[in-house]
A protein has these predicted regions:
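Generic alpha-helix structural propensity
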Residues: 2, 27-31, 325
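Conserved catalytic alpha/beta cores of large enzymes that bind or transform nucleotide phosphates
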Residues: 3-5, 10-11
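Hydrophobic face of alpha-helices
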Residues: 4, 30-33, 146, 200
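Extracytosolic ligand-binding ectodomains
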Residues: 4, 100, 371-374
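Non-catalytic alpha/beta scaffold blocks inside enzyme catalytic domains
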Residues: 10, 48-355
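A conserved hydrophobic secondary-structure block that centers on an alpha-helix together
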Residues: 12-47, 51-55, 77, 90-95
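Long, low-complexity segments enriched in small/aliphatic residues
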Residues: 343-378
Length: 378
């Protein structure tokens, strides 16, 4: 009731409040948050990923209209050209090593050829140490390499500035290999620049690469650095009257935390959902003790068309509340988060499959929901 009264007063007076959360790749959570924002139009939602992939997300959204990240199946690759992408580590969520190793084992029968992997990078990485050719390059040269590949493969644009002769030789060699088997080749990059990431997507589109999957992309992150920077600016300038956080600890993970901490303490209202009294919780007016994930219901769509259910393994041990259940109470709903998950799945996700069967299996696949086409070319 206290939270509802505060939020209602802020809404009546059009005082700006921000809901700052982690990425929730949960269709039901997104639905509840959307209803919450509809009831309180003065509240804006900002998604914050402590380890950001905002540039990659921006690029994919600009070209394909969905805030997501392309997925890759390296088991289909004959040529892998990586520009500062440590994809054998935690690049874009990780999980690529198994597909990569499938084409890296010599075949004694010689019926299958090993994939060729070249790594252009400014610092030694796990992926670079496993490459057939590792080419050290300055960060400024890495962008030129991407531009050169784009220009040669798509036939668009001109590249200004020259490359080191050794690097130039490797780039030309890459282009020759790619053009011999374009649909079995892939170009990836870890450069934190949305323009570079757009070029990477357009290169792979031009190659008609079978390695990249844009129709069922990864939805594990949604953070937007532009919105985050706007939030920080509004917080420090006193334009915000309230902040609600869930699943994030910005006073630990953001830079310049002393200045942000001081601004956070000057808010008229601050509510932190947290399992422990972390740095952000200590500076908040109110702390809402949340369930551990082992005590919680949840649904997830980590990859487009792949839906998963999470069931609690134990009852809540303490007097805690799940973030989604709290929002439902603020919305005066009699339903629990579990009830909403069940209703949402039955009405919007399941196609002829029963809820009980999905609950037993723990997942449901629907690959008919999306067929993305490029909305932008260069």
């Amino acid at each position: 009731n206290l939270v509802r009264v505060n939020l209602t007063n802020f809404s009546k007076n059009d005082k700006k409040v921000v809901l700052l959360t982690q990425t929730y790749p949960s269709p039901t959570s997104k639905e509840i948050i959307s209803e919450f924002l509809d009831q309180y139009p003065n509240i804006s939602h900002v998604t914050y990923d402590a380890i950001s992939d905002s540039s990659t997300l921006d690029a994919f959204e600009n070209i394909y209209g969905l805030r997501a990240m392309a997925d890759y199946d390296f088991s289909k690759a004959e040529n892998i050209i990586s520009i500062d992408a440590d994809f054998l580590s935690d690049w874009q969520g990780g999980g690529y090593s198994s597909g990569y190793t499938m084409t890296r084992v010599p075949d004694k029968s010689k019926k299958k050829t090993m994939s060729y992997h070249i790594q252009f990078e400014s610092n030694l990485t796990l992926t670079g140490s496993n490459a057939d050719d590792r080419v050290p390059a300055r960060p400024s040269d890495l962008k030129k390499i991407v531009a050169r590949l784009y220009s040669k493969i798509t036939g668009n644009g001109e590249v200004k500035g020259s490359l080191n002769p050794t690097i130039d030789k490797y780039v030309d060699s890459c282009i020759d290999k790619i053009l011999k088997s374009p649909n079995k080749s892939v170009v990836v990059s870890g450069i934190d620049d949305s323009d570079v990431q757009e070029l990477i997507l357009l290169i792979n589109k031009s190659l008609n690469s079978e390695v990249i999957d844009i129709n069922n992309p990864r939805l594990i992150k949604e953070g937007d650095n532009k919105k985050l920077n706007e939030f920080i600016s509004d917080l420090e300038s006193g334009k915000l009257y309230g902040v609600i956080t869930s699943g994030v600890n910005p006073l630990y993970s953001l830079p310049n935390t002393d200045q942000i901490k001081e601004a956070f303490k000057n808010l008229e209202f601050s509510l932190v959902f947290s399992e422990k009294e972390d740095e952000t919780a200590k500076s908040a007016m109110y702390i809402a003790a949340t369930n551990n994930y082992l005590e919680s219901w949840g649904d997830y769509e980590l990859k487009k068309g792949n839906f998963f259910l999470a069931q609690p393994t134990i009852r809540p041990l303490f007097d805690t509340v799940q973030f989604q259940d709290f929002l439902l109470k603020v919305l005066n709903s009699d339903l629990s988060f579990y009830d909403r998950i069940k209703s949402n799945w039955q009405n919007r996700i399941l196609r002829g499959k029963t809820w009980g069967k999905s609950l037993q299996d723990g997942y449901y696949n629907d690959f008919s929901s999306l067929n993305l086409r490029a909305q932008k070319t260069r």
